[in-house]
Amino acid sequence: MSAAAPQDLVASPETPGTKHFPPFVPSDELEAEAAKRLVQFPDDQKRSAVLPILHFIQHHHGFISADAIDWTARRLGLEPIKVLEVVSFYPGFRQSAPGKFHIRVCRTLSCAMGGSYELMERLCELTGIDRSKMDSHHHPVGVSPCGNFSVEFAECLASCGTAPVCMVNDDFHEGVAADKAENLLAKYKP
């Protein structure tokens, strides 16, 4: 029995955000990063490089595609299922393309009490994201029909005193009540 191909193992559905991310092609920069990480571990522990390599891929490619899983597995001498286990275990790894502007809304206690759930509802309403298709395990990211915006809940973003807080890509925003959602989105018009 042969091993399943990663595309058979991974649910990487195309989303409207896919148009903002080119297909995965290993770059010279990725090869150099993988080589740098691999020399940090003894030969019998090369699999330890999987996390830093996956973080690099997601940072540069937006998400971890089936092709990226396959490349990582081949580069580390692993079966693709071993890489998929890591990708599917950690909620920070995305298996489908987010929007051009990815919004992470803190949902821990201070932010929840400050209105982060209402903020999430308002962001979804303004961007046309269907919250009923989002869940905390398999599809935590909702993508707008135009592909420009995506939203997901995040655990603590470490600014409890200025709740509710969110991040848009790498930009941090404090005190973003639901009634400020429209102003927030206006800053990120494509």
Regions of interest found by a model, annotated:
Residues 2-190:
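Signature of N-terminal electron-transfer/Fe-S-associated modules in redox systems
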